[in-house]
Amino acid sequence: MLVRTTAGSDPEISLFRLDLRGKRADQALGELSQYLDRALLSGREGVEIVHGRGTGALRKEVHAFLKTFPGIASFALAPEDQGGDGVTIVTFK
């Protein structure tokens, strides 16, 4: 599921969100790879990945994958008011 959200008060800056909650790691990582490819090709500055809180297993898999994906400048957990440890914010190079 892709959801468009605006970041801050600047309407020109937008983040796009991929919701991976409830998916198995292999399925989630396949979707994540395709999603990141499309986001990079479209010139996005960054995206949000929703992996949920739960046990943290999916978050760990997503973070391990992001460490190896080319084109990513950084990633970090979202501030608590934006999803906290259930959301990872990715910034592209």
Role assignments for model-derived ranges:
Residues 1-93:
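Long, charged, low-complexity intrinsically disordered regions
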